[in-house]
């Protein structure tokens, strides 16, 4: 059996389709649902998987750069984080292209495509969403409002998927 290798052209198409799919889902969720607040039901709840609408102003799990570096103000921290994301995407992109050119496993290539597409989607969110949408807090966002909820480079990243791998009960 001959296995076809993922080359640059197929990798580019795969990443493009992933980013397009990611953005279409985010647009649909933002324009049809308010933010999922703590203790509110999920949009979709299959037990092991939940679809939530959460916006993240910082990094993973809501951490902000100025939580780690308290001498930074909110403005500088958010701008630095967005610029870091852009620089990181170039690094990930270089790694992806060099891997696609080599005779590496398709699993590695697909994994890097997924990471790159996710990082690119986060950049689109943080750079443009503040201008493209109104606030989603307590309401459904509007597309292309007169004034967005944040300036260019200061939008929130949309996080939606939650896979439950560990469950526990918080002590009261």
Language-model segments: residues:
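Alpha-helical transmembrane bundles and membrane-interface segments of multipass inner-membrane proteins
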Residues: 1-172
């Amino acid at each position: 059996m001959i296995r076809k290798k993922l080359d640059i052209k197929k990798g580019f198409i795969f990443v493009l389709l992933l980013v397009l799919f990611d953005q279409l889902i985010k647009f649909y969720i933002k324009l049809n649902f308010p933010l999922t607040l703590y203790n509110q039901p999920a949009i979709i709840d299959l037990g092991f998987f939940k679809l939530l609408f959460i916006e993240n102003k910082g990094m993973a799990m809501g951490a902000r750069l100025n939580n780690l570096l308290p001498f930074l103000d909110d403005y500088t921290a958010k701008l630095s984080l967005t610029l870091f994301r852009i620089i990181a995407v170039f690094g990930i992109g270089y790694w992806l292209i060099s891997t696609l050119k080599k005779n590496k496993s398709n699993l590695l290539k697909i994994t890097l495509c997924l990471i790159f597409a996710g990082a690119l989607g986060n950049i689109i969110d943080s750079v443009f969403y503040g201008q493209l949408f109104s606030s989603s807090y307590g309401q459904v966002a509007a597309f292309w409002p007169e004034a967005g909820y944040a300036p260019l480079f200061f939008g929130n990243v949309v996080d939606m998927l939650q896979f439950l791998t560990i469950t526990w009960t918080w002590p009261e």
